[in-house]
C-alpha cells in the first residue's frame, strides 16, 4: 500500500536551496551517488567479516547505467540496502536545521558544507526532476520498497519488485541537464571522481573492434582501481610501481625525480604519494597537479591551503578522511586538522630531501637543477622550511660545482671579503653573455656563482638578509676591482677638463635606444684592463627584476635601463683618443673655453653679491643678469659639445670601442652590428 508524506525539513524551500546554493558544482552529484553506493557495499563487507551476515556476498560491483530513452541515470549496488523504517529515518528526515541561519552564515562561500550536513543524497536533485530509490535490506524478512520524490517536500513509498539486497538510485534527468545523459560525459565524470574508489565501479561493457565497428563485449567496463598505490605498504613496493602509478596519473609526462610516500594515522589520518616532477623549463611550472581524495573519493585538485604553497608545484595524491568533502577554501585554511596536515607534509618533504642529500649527494646534485625551483620557493615562502632546507640547499658556480651555504661561505671568505668586512658573493645570470666579466673575476681568484633560475632574484635578496654581513653582486655590476673593494678607489690622473672632454666624445656617439640610458665614467683601471666596458647598477637592475615578482613596484618596471660606459684612462687606446681630440679640437675649443671660463667666473661673482640677501632684496635687474649669464654658459657648453661631437663622429676608434663594449653585452644588433662589421674590415685593411 502506498504511503505519502512530507520530508522533514524546517522550510519548504529546501530543494531550491540545494539546487541553487549548496552545490555550486552540479557535476559532483555523481560523486555523491557513487560514493554512497560504495559506502553501502563496504558496510556489507564489514558485516560479513564480523559474522553479522551469513549469506553469500556475491558480486559487489557498483553499476552505473544510462537509459537515454527513459532519460534516466541509475546507480546500483548490492550493499546493505534499506528497510522502510531506515528510508524514513535517513532519507525523509534531512539532518538540517536552521536553514535561514545557515544561509546567513555561509552566503559568501562558494562551496558550502554538504556531507557535513548529511545532504549528499540530495545532490541528485540538482540534475533531476524526479528521483526514485528501489531498495531491499540485507536483513532477513525485509521486503523491497520504492521511494520517490519529484523535488517538492512530498514523497511516496510503495512496495517494489527486487529479488536481491541493495539499492537502485534512479535519476530522471532534468531537461536543462541533458548533458548527464551523454555516455562520454558520464565516463569523464566517473574517471575524474571515482577512479580510485574502494569497490569496483562498472559503467557499461568494454568494447572491441568487430566487423568494422565498435561492439560491446561481455566484460564489465571497470573504471576504477580499488587498491590504489597510496593505500599499500611502502615496503612492499618497488620503484617501478611508483613510476607506473605516476604514468597512470599523468600520461605523457617525463619520469619524476623521486617521490615521498605519506602514511600517518596520528594525530590525523593521511596517506598519499607526492612526486617531484622533472621540469625542463620555467614555462612548464604548473600548480594544482596534486589530487585530493577523501577515503579514495576525489575531492579537488585546488589544494592551496591544504599543502604548503610551494608544494602545490608537486604532483601526486593526498587522501585524508579528516578533510571534509565539500568545504570552502576559507574553511579549509582555518581548519585545525588541515593546518596540522600542511605542517606534516612540509616536514616530510624536508626530511626526504635531507635524506637523499645525506645518503647520495652525487644523485642529489645531478637533480638539483630540477629541485631548485621547489626548494627556493619553499625557503622564500615559509620560514620554517628555510630553517630545515638551509643545510641541503645548494649553490652552483659557473664551473658546475655545488656547495651548501656553509661550504661556499668557507670557500670565499678569505679572498672575497671587502675592506668593510662584507662577504661578497659574485654571480652571473648567463654564462655566455657575461663571459668576459666572469673571466675577469676569475683572473682575480674570485669564485662566481651561476644564478639562472626563475626565483634567484628574490633568493638573493633573502640571503642578504639571512647571512650576516653578506652582499651579492653580479659580475657586470662594476669593474672587477670595484666589485670587491679592498682599498680606496684609485683616482684617474687626468685633469677634470680632459675627463669631461673624453666623456663627451664617447657620450655623443652612444646609440639612442628606447627605454635605455647611458652614462659615461672615466676611471683608472690599469694598462692590462679593457679600454672600455659597460656595467649596470646592481641596485637598479635588481629593483627592476623584483618588480616582476612584487606588487607595488611598477615604478621601477617603468624606469629605463641604466648602463655605465666606463673608459679606462690608463689604456693606450683611450689615451690616444684624448690626445687626438685635444690636437684636432684645440683651435676650435680655445675661444669657446675662454668665453666659458669668463662666464662661469661672472656667474660666481653674481651669486657672491647676492649671498646674504633675502629674495625680496634682489632686484629684477640682478635676476635678469643671472638668467642671461646662465643662458650664455649653456650656449657655450653646447658649442663645446658640438665641436667634440663633430670630431668624435669621424673617429673610427671611438665608434669601434663603443661597439665592442655593446657587443660584449649583447647590445649590438641589426644595422649597428652590420656597420661595426664593415668598419672592422676597413680598419684591418
Which residue stretches match the model-derived regions?
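GHKL (Bergerat-fold) ATPase N-terminal catalytic module, capturing the glycine-rich phosphate-binding loop
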Residues: 1-175, 179-180, 188, 195, ...
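GHKL/Bergerat-fold ATPase module in large chromosome/replication-associated machines
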Residues: 113, 131-154, 174-178, 184-685
Amino acid at each position: 500500500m502506498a504511503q505519502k508524506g512530507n520530508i522533514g525539513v524546517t522550510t519548504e524551500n529546501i530543494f531550491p536551496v540545494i539546487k541553487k546554493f549548496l552545490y555550486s558544482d552540479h557535476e559532483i552529484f555523481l560523486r555523491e551517488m557513487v560514493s554512497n553506493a560504495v559506502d553501502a557495499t563496504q558496510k556489507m563487507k564489514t558485516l560479513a567479516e564480523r559474522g553479522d551476515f551469513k549469506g553469500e556476498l556475491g558480486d559487489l560491483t557498483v553499476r552505473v547505467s544510462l537509459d537515454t530513452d527513459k532519460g534516466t541515470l541509475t546507480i546500483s549496488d548490492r550493499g546493505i540496502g534499506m528497510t522502510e523504517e531506515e528510508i524514513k529515518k535517513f532519507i525523509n528526515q534531512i539532518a538540517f536545521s536552521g536553514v535561514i541561519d545557515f544561509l546567513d552564515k555561509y552566503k559568501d562561500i562558494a562551496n558550502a558544507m554538504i556531507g557535513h550536513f548529511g545532504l549528499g543524497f540530495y545532490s541528485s536533485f540538482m540534475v533531476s526532476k524526479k528521483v526514485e530509490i528501489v531498495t531491499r535490506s540485507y536483513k532477513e524478512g525485509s521486503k523491497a520498497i520504492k521511494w520517490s520524490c519529484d523535488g517538492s517536500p512530498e514523497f511516496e513509498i510503495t512496495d517494489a519488485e527486487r529479488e536481491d539486497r541493495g539499492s537502485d538510485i534512479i535519476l530522471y534527468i532534468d531537461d536543462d541537464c541533458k548533458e548527464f545523459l551523454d555516455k562520454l560525459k558520464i565516463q569523464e565524470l566517473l574517471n575524474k571522481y571515482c577512479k580510485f574508489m574502494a569497490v569496483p565501479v562498472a559503467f557499461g561493457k568494454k568494447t572491441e573492434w568487430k566487423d568494422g565497428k565498435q561492439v560491446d563485449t561481455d566484460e564489465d567496463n571497470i573504471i576504477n582501481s580499488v587498491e590504489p598505490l597510496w593505500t599499500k605498504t611502502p615496503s612492499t613496493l618497488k620503484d617501478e610501481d611508483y613510476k607506473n602509478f605516476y604514468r597512470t596519473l599523468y600520461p605523457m609526462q617525463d619520469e619524476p625525480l623521486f617521490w615521498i610516500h605519506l602514511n600517518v594515522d596520528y594525530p590525523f589520518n593521511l596517506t598519499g604519494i607526492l612526486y617531484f616532477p622533472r621540469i625542463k623549463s620555467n614555462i612548464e611550472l604548473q600548480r594544482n597537479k596534486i589530487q585530493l581524495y577523501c577515503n579514495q573519493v576525489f575531492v579537488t585538485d585546488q589544494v592551496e591551503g591544504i599543502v604548503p604553497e610551494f608544494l602545490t608545484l608537486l604532483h601526486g595524491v593526498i587522501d585524508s578522511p579528516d578533510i571534509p568533502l565539500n568545504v570552502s577554501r576559507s574553511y579549509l585554511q582555518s581548519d585545525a586538522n588541515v593546518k596540522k596536515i600542511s605542517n606534516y607534509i612540509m616536514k616530510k618533504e624536508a626530511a626526504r630531501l635531507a635524506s637523499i642529500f645525506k645518503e647520495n649527494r652525487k644523485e642529489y646534485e645531478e637533480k638539483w637543477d630540477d629541485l631548485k625551483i621547489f626548494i627556493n620557493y619553499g625557503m622564500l615562502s615559509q620560514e620554517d622550511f628555510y630553517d630545515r632546507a638551509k643545510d641541503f640547499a645548494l649553490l652552483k658556480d659557473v664551473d658546475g660545482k655545488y656547495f651548501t651555504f656553509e661550504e661556499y661561505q668557507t670557500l670565499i671568505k678569505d679572498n672575497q671579503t671587502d675592506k668593510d668586512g662584507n662577504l661578497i658573493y659574485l654571480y652571473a645570470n648567463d654564462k655566455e653573455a657575461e663571459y668576459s666579466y666572469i673571466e675577469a673575476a676569475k683572473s682575480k681568484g674570485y669564485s662566481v656563482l651561476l644564478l639562472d633560475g626563475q626565483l634567484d632574484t628574490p633568493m638573493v635578496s633573502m640571503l642578504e638578509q639571512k647571512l650576516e654581513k653578506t652582499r651579492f653582486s653580479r659580475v657586470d655590476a662594476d669593474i672587477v676591482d670595484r666589485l670587491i673593494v679592498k682599498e680606496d678607489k684609485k683616482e684617474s690622473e687626468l685633469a677634470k677638463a680632459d675627463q669631461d672632454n673624453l666623456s663627451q666624445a664617447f657620450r655623443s656617439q652612444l646609440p639612442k635606444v628606447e627605454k635605455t640610458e647611458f652614462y659615461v665614467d672615466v676611471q683608472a683601471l690599469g694598462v692590462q684592463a679593457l679600454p672600455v666596458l659597460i656595467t649596470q647598477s646592481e641596485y637598479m637592475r635588481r629593483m627592476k627584476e623584483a618588480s616582476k615578482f612584487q606588487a607595488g613596484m611598477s615604478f621601477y618596471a617603468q624606469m629605463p635601463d641604466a648602463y655605465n660606459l666606463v673608459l679606462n684612462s690608463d689604456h693606450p687606446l683611450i689615451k690616444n683618443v684624448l690626445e687626438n681630440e685635444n690636437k684636432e679640437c684645440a683651435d676650435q675649443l680655445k675661444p669657446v673655453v675662454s668665453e666659458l671660463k669668463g662666464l662661469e667666473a661672472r656667474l660666481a661673482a653674481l651669486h657672491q653679491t647676492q649671498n646674504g640677501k633675502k629674495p625680496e632684496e634682489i632686484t629684477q635687474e640682478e635676476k635678469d643678469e643671472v638668467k642671461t649669464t646662465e643662458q650664455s654658459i649653456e650656449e657655450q657648453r653646447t658649442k663645446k659639445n658640438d665641436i667634440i661631437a663633430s670630431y668624435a663622429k669621424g673617429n673610427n676608434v671611438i665608434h669601434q670601442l663603443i661597439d665592442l663594449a655593446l657587443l660584449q653585452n649583447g647590445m649590438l644588433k641589426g644595422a649597428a652590428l652590420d656597420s661595426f662589421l664593415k668598419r672592422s674590415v676597413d680598419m684591418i685593411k
